[in-house]
From Swiss-Prot:
Zn(2+) binds at H66, H68, H236, D311. InterPro entries: Amidohydro-rel (IPR006680), HutI (IPR005920), Metal-dep_hydrolase_composite (IPR011059), Metal_Hydrolase (IPR032466). Catalyzes the hydrolytic cleavage of the carbon-nitrogen bond in imidazolone-5-propanoate to yield N-formimidoyl-L-glutamate. It is the third step in the universal histidine degradation pathway. Keywords: Cytoplasm, Histidine metabolism, Hydrolase, Iron, Metal-binding, Zinc. The gene is hutI. Pathway: Amino-acid degradation; L-histidine degradation into L-glutamate; N-formimidoyl-L-glutamate from L-histidine: step 3/3. Coiled coil: none annotated. Binds 1 zinc or iron ion per subunit. 4-imidazolone-5-propanoate binds at R75, Y138, H171, Q239, T316. This is Imidazolonepropionase.
Length: 401
């Protein structure tokens, strides 16, 4: 079906800028953008349907490029404990922290994990999200990592949403491998990753590179295996300390390196040269009350593409609003509203390996967009909370009004 969408203004986000078109029109067909530009320049078109968008501002569908949306259990009790002065180490000694999420995720059935993840993902969708990434990493063994990745595939099958599934088996050390990190990495490389990739459950491979998780040398072994399997890589890096994990990620042409509060100028240069996207996660920064800011000036100076994401997870960023992350990116990290919107559209698409098809409104790209009843694009980062009036279109078909 060919649809003409008109009476709107468009922030195309081409090249990471608003690249605004006022009094615009969009023609979609077969799920793609067939034409976009000033309405006055549109030649007569035979459309099956014409939609008046009422003067709305149209942006690409929002992309949440870093989530841990599939998990069992709830850690709000730990949140209360931390606010009462209990340290993370004390909580962990009591069996809390990520270990509690691993236990709950292992105990949950696939259907239970799907039901809870569906609710969280639908909350993100209400903010205009049309594409997101879902990581595993709370199973930490083959059966349970498979279970999590199967849920990610089910979310894509049952919701009007594009989902990229990332294997994060190297998220933490499972209890059965206590004190044997090298053995666990070998297990991932030799057994888990080949099996999961062979089942078509993995779009990318991620790891957590930190003193409390895995070393750069251990991560590199995983990256070598991912390369053998033809899988792109990503990395949690420089969140709590500087191990130059982001430079390691760049050496393997990673799609992204994420967090990055402690990255150096040298890391920024490496990422820029490799085209690796910097994914900033202000929700975790806020929730943990951190003070070390990502080096925004270095990222800008060297031309590193900057994305924003929710980091939705039960322990450090239980955030169900990507629009809130736009505001946090501006207020916490001093991003401009234009940079923030690029961070959840065009640069987020690149961070998922979808830059050729998603993230900006251009001819030939997927017709995912949101028509917002706002005065200007900056309003998306300005308003805190609430459900802004909007119409969400995925692959040329309206999914909400």
């Amino acid at each position: 079906m060919r649809t003409l969408w008109q009476h709107c203004h468009v922030a195309t986000m081409a090249d990471g800028r608003y690249s605004a078109i006022e009094d615009a029109a969009i023609v979609t067909s077969a799920g793609l953008i067939e034409w976009i530009g000033p309405r006055a320049e549109l030649a007569p078109v035979e459309a099956d349907r014409t939609v008046d968008l009422g003067g709305a501002w149209v942006t690409p569908g929002l992309i949440d490029c870093h989530t841990h949306a599939v998990f069992g259990g709830n850690r709000s009790g730990e949140f209360e404990q931390r606010l009462q002065g209990v340290s993370y180490a004390e909580i962990a000694a009591q069996g809390g922290g990520i270990a509690s999420t691993v236990r709950a995720t292992r105990a949950a059935s696939e259907d239970e994990l799907f039901a809870s993840a569906r609710q969280r993902v639908q909350a993100l969708m209400r903010d205009g999200v049309t594409t997101l990434e879902v990581k595993s990493g709370y199973g930490l063994d083959l059966a349970n990592e498979r279970k999590m990745l199967r849920v990610a595939r089910r979310l894509a099958d049952e919701l009007p949403l594009t989902v990229r599934a990332t294997c994060l088996a190297a998220h933490a050390l499972p209890p059965e491998y206590a004190g044997r990190a090298d053995d666990y990495i070998a297990h991932i490389c030799d057994e888990m990753l080949p099996a999961l990739a062979g089942e078509g459950l993995v779009d990318a491979v991620d790891a957590f590179c930190e003193h409390l998780a895995f070393s750069p040398a251990q991560v590199e072994r995983l990256f070598i295996k991912a390369r053998e399997l033809g899988l792109p890589v990503k990395l949690h890096a420089e969140q709590l300390s500087s191990l130059h994990g982001s430079s390691l990620a760049a050496r393997y042409q990673a799609l992204s390196a994420d967090h990055l509060e402690f990255m150096t100028e040298e890391d920024a240069v490496a990422m820029a040269n490799a085209g690796t996207v910097a994914v900033l996660l202000p929700g975790a920064f806020y929730f943990l009350r951190e003070t070390q800011l990502p080096p925004m000036d270095a990222l800008r100076r060297h031309g590193v593409k900057i994305a924003l994401a929710s980091d939705l997870n039960p322990g450090t960023s239980p955030g169900l609003s990507l629009r809130l992350m736009l505001n946090m990116g501006c207020t916490c990290f001093r991003m401009t509203p234009e940079e923030a919107l690029a961070g959840v559209t065009v640069h987020a698409a690149t961070a998922l390996g979808l830059g050729d098809s998603h993230g900006s409104l251009q001819v030939g790209k997927v017709a995912d967009f949101v028509a917002w009843q706002i005065e200007r694009p900056a309003d998306l980062a300005y308003w805190l909370g609430g459900d802004l009036p909007k119409r969400v279109v995925r692959m040329g078909h309206e999914i909400s009004n």
